[in-house]
């Protein structure tokens, strides 16, 4: 008979729950593992729709904790289909006798934290109440299908199917009139297969999505060979990579090459049939709209090359979101399907569905009858399964109410007010933006080690602090803010579910950076956590990941170049490196006008670049000085920053060059700065600026030049300075 009081209750027997069960046994914890389905596999148990397939190569989408599996299980394809992935899960479960530790067909109806006993009370669909010290949600990110938000769904008398809850026995559409509503991943994967059988297929599309062919075949030989040669290194690189797959990060900007060159590079990645390779072609496609447009146009070109009807091709081409800002899809003949005479595409933007009827669908000015309707309307992703589990923490607060305006977690693993509650691949972790197998193993390892640490050190509870949780929220937001992801209405942002908060759910900073943050937390004595036992308490409050993500990204990029330290370079070498780096940077926003000119400095002419706002003038003026340690840089080297300053402040920015060391030692730069200020003041009206509203600005060494210029003007009766903008000034 199962114990009613255990150390750990785990909800879910997908890949996360299975591995955690194995580790709980190994470390001697008592447990109950509850699974709503009647078999293991999680998302691969529930999602049996035709064409369901993993978009991560099988060389990478697998467990690493059991080395024997690498020899005992051989994948048949590069991108495995759902039946094979489910068989893999079953194979692992049988090999490690996991079936005996899982209670199938058992749902959790609710869970409450008991502050007096420091334990969770778990209520199940069987009527049993289980108490436990630790409660783990291994419920998966894509396990709760989204209900169709369409009028009249209950009226239809034909067959209704939901891709996320496909019948186990399969469906035969031969000779049927079929409607598919939705063109996300499940729609794109299932539509070609349904079209092979259906007499008539009508696809209702609201938003076109990017997709590429899988070019499926055997597992990629180059990675197979790498794994054989040095599996340990390969897997280590995966764990500290950006996505959980050990790909070499690109150092090429999409804006530094011609379109022809860019398309050639993208074509090479396209032929590999791997989404990650395509997305990794350029270093800036996720952070710069113009760079992303290069990739997006390549993808639209591919659609036009396949779909024969230009109007249909245009409808299937995404324009309203950037490549990767919604989950790209991987297909087997999706776009080719729309060349078939019995397949029709309906644009819901011009012909919206008015209602589902008893016999079909009323849309636009038409009514059509169907034998079957397939809802490929996606999932309540990442938070749906957790929130619907009716979890109540301290002081009677439910997780649903706490997350009303967006999920709040620390590391995507825990949440304030819910002691000893853990979420595997929860919101605030890389999860759906990663190779899930790598992320699952990392989370399970972290939870296992934390439970062991608590047991060995006499702690009963662990809970994050409000400071740490808020700090992590800010860090996750900062990471998202430097990308273009927030421009899209995607399920990454919760935008596919009416009423769901619109925030970035997954952590976008990368698998490796996330892992290092988790390691830092542990190495600093569980930074940001409060641990308590009957006789002791520990709280090492603080913030993890305090470096701004864009700065971290730049430093990480520089480290990949394996360059000598800047201070060891000669002036000539440093200047060459600076110019090359500047050329690779994404351009800043558009401004009204950019003109170059020369002005009189303290000892000869100085070049300048003027950035004029798009609004009518005259404008306030900021005289800007570039950074570069007084040795390198120029009036154009901070171009993206100057554009941004101009656009955001509605100010005329005049970036002025100055003489550099060692050829022109101190005080040459400062003298040039003051001379430039006086020239700009004297010529303000001709430049379109306001002489009475002049500020000085600068970055790094340029910040120093700006500050000294202001002092010189004050002390010698020069132009009146309205203000100083000093960005990381050298002092």
Could you say what each language-model-derived stretch is?
Residues 2-8, 13-154, 169-170, 183, ...:
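N-terminal FAD-binding dinucleotide-binding subdomain shared by FAD-dependent oxidases/monooxygenases
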Residues 10, 178-180, 696:
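Conserved alpha/beta-hydrolase fold motif
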Residues 20, 189-190, 705-709:
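Hydrolases whose catalytic domains are alpha/beta-hydrolase-1, hotdog thioesterase
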Residues 125-128, 600, 608-618:
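Short beta-strand-to-loop junctions in surface cap/lid or active-site-entrance loops
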Residues 263-270, 282, 540-610:
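A glycine/proline-hinged amphipathic helix-loop "lid/cap" segment
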Residues 619-628:
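Short beta-strand element of the alpha/beta-hydrolase
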Residues 634-635, 641, 649, 654-693:
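Catalytic nucleophile-loop/oxyanion-hole region of alpha/beta-hydrolase
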Residues 675-687, 691-731:
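Primarily recognizes the serine-hydrolase "nucleophile elbow" in alpha/beta-hydrolase
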């Amino acid at each position: 008979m199962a114990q009613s009081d255990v150390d750990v209750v785990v909800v879910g027997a997908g890949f996360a729950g299975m591995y955690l069960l194995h580790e709980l046994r190994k470390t001697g914890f008592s447990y109950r593992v509850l699974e709503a389905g009647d078999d293991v596999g999680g998302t691969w148990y529930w999602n049996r729709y035709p064409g369901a397939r993993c978009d991560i190569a099988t060389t990478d989408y697998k467990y690493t904790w059991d080395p024997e599996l690498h020899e005992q299980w051989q994948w048949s394809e590069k991108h495995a289909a759902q039946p094979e992935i489910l068989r893999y899960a079953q194979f692992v479960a049988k090999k490690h006798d996991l079936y005996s530790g899982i209670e199938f067909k058992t749902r959790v109806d609710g869970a409450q934290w008991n502050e007096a006993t420091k334990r969770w009370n778990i209520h199940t669909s069987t009527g049993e109440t289980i108490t436990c010290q630790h409660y783990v949600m291994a419920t998966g990110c894509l396990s709760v299908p989204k209900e169709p938000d369409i009028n009249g769904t209950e009226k239809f008398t034909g067959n209704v199917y939901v891709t996320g809850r496909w019948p186990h026995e399969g469906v035969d559409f031969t000779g049927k009139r079929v409607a598919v509503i939705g063109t996300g991943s499940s729609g794109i994967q299932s539509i070609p297969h349904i079209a092979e059988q259906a007499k008539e297929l009508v696809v209702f599309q609201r938003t076109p999505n990017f997709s590429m062919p899988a070019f499926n075949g055997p597992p990629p030989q180059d990675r197979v060979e790498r794994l054989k040669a040095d599996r340990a290194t390969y897997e280590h690189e995966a764990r500290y990579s950006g996505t959980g797959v050990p790909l070499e990060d690109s150092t090429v900007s999409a804006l530094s090459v011609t379109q022809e060159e860019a398309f050639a590079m993208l074509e090479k990645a396209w032929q590999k049939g791997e989404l990650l390779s395509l997305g990794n072609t350029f270093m800036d496609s996720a952070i710069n709209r113009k760079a992303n447009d290069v990739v997006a146009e390549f993808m639209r070109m591919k659609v036009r090359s396949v779909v024969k009807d230009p109007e249909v091709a245009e409808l299937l081409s995404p324009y309203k979101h950037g490549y990767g800002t919604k989950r790209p899809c991987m297909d087997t003949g999706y776009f080719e399907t729309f060349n078939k005479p019995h397949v029709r595409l309906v644009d819901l933007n011009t012909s919206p569905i008015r209602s589902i009827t008893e016999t079909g669908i009323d849309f636009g000015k038409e009514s059509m009858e169907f034998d079957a309707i397939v809802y490929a309307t996606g999932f309540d992703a990442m938070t749906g399964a957790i929130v619907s589990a009716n979890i109540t923490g301290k002081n009677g607060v439910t997780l649903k109410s706490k997350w009303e305006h967006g999920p709040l977690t620390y590391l995507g693993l825990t949440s304030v007010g819910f002691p000893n509650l853990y979420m595997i691949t929860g919101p605030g972790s890389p999860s759906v933006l990663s190779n899930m197998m790598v992320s699952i193993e990392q989370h399970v390892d972290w939870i296992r080690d934390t439970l062991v640490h608590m047991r060995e050190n006499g702690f009963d509870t662990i809970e994050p602090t409000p400071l740490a949780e808020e700090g992590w929220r800010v860090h996750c937001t900062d990471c998202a803010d430097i990308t273009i992801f927030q421009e899209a209405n995607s399920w990454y942002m919760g935008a596919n579910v009416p009423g769901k908060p619109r925030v970035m759910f997954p952590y976008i900073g990368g698998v490796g950076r996330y892992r290092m943050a988790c390691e830092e937390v542990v190495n600093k004595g569980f930074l940001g956590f409060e641990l308590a036992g009957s006789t002791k308490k520990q709280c090492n409050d603080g913030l993890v990941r305090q470096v701004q993500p864009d700065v971290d990204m730049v430093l990480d990029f520089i480290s990949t170049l394996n360059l000598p330290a800047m201070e060891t370079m000669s002036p000539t070498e440093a200047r060459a490196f600076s110019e090359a780096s500047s050329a690779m940077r994404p351009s800043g926003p558009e401004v009204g006008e950019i003109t170059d000119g020369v002005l009189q400095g303290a000892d000869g002419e100085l070049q300048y670049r003027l950035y004029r706002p798009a609004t009518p003038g005259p404008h306030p003026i900021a005289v800007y000085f570039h950074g570069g340690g007084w040795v390198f840089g120029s009036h154009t080297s901070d171009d993206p920053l100057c554009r941004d300053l101009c656009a955001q402040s509605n100010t005329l920015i005049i970036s002025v060059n100055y003489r550099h060391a060692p050829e022109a030692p101190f005080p040459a730069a400062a003298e040039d700065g003051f001379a430039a200020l006086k020239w700009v003041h004297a010529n303000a009206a001709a430049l379109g600026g306001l002489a009475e509203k002049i500020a000085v600005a600068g970055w790094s060494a340029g910040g120093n030049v700006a500050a000294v210029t202001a002092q010189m003007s004050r002390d010698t009766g020069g132009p009146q300075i309205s203000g100083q903008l000093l960005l990381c000034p050298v002092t």
